[in-house]
């Protein structure tokens, strides 16, 4: 049985759409779930606040503004300060920290840092596991330190921070049913967020 059939059953049982969460990894999957329910049931998207990506849910739960989220321009500024180049990516369509990463040296280094955080590993352990000797360990540490300092001073956050903060708060929305889409794509950290979401609903898929 597909998630959409199970969601249909929940609605038929009388569970209000705003008490059903369907979370996913990508915006595309979240949008498809929302549109399917809207089309089948004539429900307004605004009445389905929890059909969204995990990052969107963490963003909204934390009450953040888009100005607080670190983006490519800030990454270039950090790169200039430490002498490590970053690419010229724009801000559009960014929905994970990996989306801010391009193909330059700084981007390549940051992808290793984001990967370590998403897997719940130390940077050193991640570096050791990947065994990529094209990466200068001292340079990587210097960049990560500058990145975290910048966020602290400028009061900025990234997508991983949002999910980490959500997990730390251990307080999910008041819902009756939880559906997890694209489960195979979720990281260790994202599964920790799903564990928080699982605390209240009686129906879980």
Where are these regions (language model features)?
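P-loop NTPase Walker
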Residues: 1-68
């Amino acid at each position: 049985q597909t998630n959409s059939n199970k969601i249909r059953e929940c609605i038929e049982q009388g569970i209000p759409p705003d008490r059903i969460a369907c979370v996913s990894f990508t915006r595309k999957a979240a949008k498809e779930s929302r549109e399917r329910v809207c089309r089948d049931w004539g429900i307004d998207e605004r009445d389905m606040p929890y059909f969204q990506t995990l990052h969107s849910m963490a963003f909204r739960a934390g009450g953040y503004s888009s100005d607080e989220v670190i983006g490519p321009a800030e990454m270039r500024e950090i790169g200039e300060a430490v002498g490590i180049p970053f690419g010229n990516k724009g801000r559009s369509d960014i929905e994970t920290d990996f989306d801010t990463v391009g193909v330059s040296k700084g981007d390549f280094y940051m992808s290793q840092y984001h990967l370590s955080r998403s897997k719940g590993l130390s940077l050193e352990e991640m570096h050791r596991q990947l065994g990529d000797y094209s990466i200068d360990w001292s340079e990587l540490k210097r960049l990560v330190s500058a990145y975290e300092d910048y966020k602290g001073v400028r009061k900025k956050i990234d997508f991983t921070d949002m999910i980490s903060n959500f997990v730390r708060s251990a307080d999910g929305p008041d819902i009756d049913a939880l559906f997890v889409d694209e489960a195979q794509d979720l990281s260790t950290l994202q599964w920790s967020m799903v564990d928080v979401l699982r605390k209240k609903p009686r129906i879980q898929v």
